[in-house]
Amino acid sequence: MSEAPQHIPVLVNECLSLFADRNPKFFCDVTLGAGGHAEAFLSAYPSIVSYDGSDRDTMALSLAKERLEKFGNRVHLHHASFEDLAQNPRENVYDGILADLGVSSMQLDTLSRGFSFQGDDHDLDMRMDTSKGTTASEVLNTLREEDLGRIFREYGEEPQWKNAAKAIVQFRRHKKIITVRDLKEATTRVFPSYRLRKKIHPLTLIFQALRVYVNQEDVQLKVFLESAMRWLAPEGRLIIISFCSSEDRPVKWFFREAEAMGVGKILTKKVVMPTYEETRKNPRCRSAKLRCFEKKSS
C-alpha cells in the first residue's frame, strides 16, 4: 500500500444537514485531521466567521493548513489534545462542535505510524502525537499479562483477550515485539480458524485496543464531553462520530444523562450511519455512527 496519506471525511452531508436550519458563526472542530469536514462546513456556510480546528497529529495539521488556506482568517489551527482544550476558559461560544473519533484513513495509510496491520516491517508506534507518550511496542513489551488482557478486553472487546495476552508475554521472553510482523508472529495461534477466514483481519480488535490505550482515548473523550457542554452556545449543536462501541457507548450515555438533567436534547433519536453508497465508495466508514446533541436555549 502507498505511503501517501489520504483523507476521506465520513458522513459529511449528514453533518452539514444538522445546521441547515441556521447560520452558524462560530465553529469548533476538535479532530481536524486533514480538514475534510472543515472544508465542507466553511464552503457550505459562509456565515462561519471563525472555525477553530485542533488535532494532536502534527502531520494532519500541516495538511489541513494547506487545504484550508483558501479560507484565510476564518480558520484558526491549534496543536492540542482534548485535555489541552479542556483548559480553554471559553463558555457559551460555539454554535457547532464536531468530533470525529478514532483513527483516520490518512493515519492508517501512513504505514510508518504503526496504526495498520498491513505495514509488516514498520514499528508499532500508534501515537497520535508522536512528540510524546508511550508507543504500542513499549506497551506490549513491558505490561504484565493481566494488564494486557484487560486492555484487549475493555478497549477492543476481543473475545480471545486472555489467550492473546498470554501469547504475547510468552513470545517476548525470547524476542521483543517491535514491528507489526512481530505482533502477528506472537499471536499466530491465538485466533480460531473461522476468524482467519473472515474479511476482517483477526488483529483488528487488538490494534484498536492498543491505539485506544496508547492515546488514552477513553480519558480524553470523557474530558472532551464535559468541556463541550460548557463551550456550546445556547442552542449550539455537538456532533460526534464514532467507529466502535467503546467510543459510541460513552457518548450515547452522556447524551442521555445530559438530556435527563435538562441540559438540552438529543437530535438523533436513532444513530445516523453511512448510506450504502458511501460505504461502497469508502468501506472503512461502514462502522461509523453519528450522534448529535443540542444545548437548551438558555
UniProtKB/Swiss-Prot annotation:
Annotated localization: Cytoplasm
Cellular component GO terms, alphabetical: cytoplasm
Domain of life: Bacteria
Family annotation (Pfam families): Methyltransf_5
Homology family: Belongs to the methyltransferase superfamily. RsmH family.
GO biological process: rRNA base methylation
Enzyme class: transferase
Statement: the UniProt record of this protein carries the keyword Transferase: yes
Protein name: Ribosomal RNA small subunit methyltransferase H
InterPro entries in the record: RsmH, SAM-dep_MeTrfase_MraW_recog, SAM-dependent_MTases_sf
Record's keyword annotation contains Nucleotidyltransferase: no
UniProt gene name: rsmH
PANTHER family in the record: 12S RRNA N4-METHYLCYTIDINE METHYLTRANSFERASE (PTHR11265:SF0), S-ADENOSYL-METHYLTRANSFERASE MRAW (PTHR11265)
Organism: Chlamydia felis (strain Fe/C-56) (Chlamydophila felis)
Record-listed E.C. numbers: 2.1.1.199
Keywords: Cytoplasm, Methyltransferase, rRNA processing, S-adenosyl-L-methionine, Transferase
Annotated positions binding S-adenosyl-L-methionine: G35, G36, H37, D55, F82, D100, Q107
Catalysis performed (reactions): cytidine(1402) in 16S rRNA + S-adenosyl-L-methionine = N(4)-methylcytidine(1402) in 16S rRNA + S-adenosyl-L-homocysteine + H(+)
SUPFAM superfamilies listed in its UniProt record: Putative methyltransferase TM0872, insert domain, S-adenosyl-L-methionine-dependent methyltransferases
GO MF annotation: an example: rRNA (cytosine-N4-)-methyltransferase activity
Stretches that traverse the bilayer: none
Functional summary from the UniProt entry: Specifically methylates the N4 position of cytidine in position 1402 (C1402) of 16S rRNA.
